[in-house]
Amino acid sequence: MNIGKIQPQATEIEAFLLGSIIKNQISYDLVSALLRPEHFYKEEHSMIYKACVELITENTPIDYLTVCQQLKKNNQLEFVGGAYYVSSLTNRI
């Protein structure tokens, strides 16, 4: 009988990682070869990371403003918690 597995989750670590990426693009360069949006437990975090990937693909620097603009362009900014939440990620660093 399979009662259901709880997927591994460390949402605080996800948030810390995203804050690090937004604050310093070198962090993205270090993890991008291994990390994919679907690796995030929280859908909001997956969307934020995907926005970072899209920015890199477009040769746009990753920072608080560009991530918020990309999320807004994707109609996802409010879903992830708004600009305030994105900003709060960088304050964890």
What are these regions (language model features)?
Residues M1-I93:
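Noncatalytic partner-interaction/assembly domains of nucleic-acid and motor enzyme complexes
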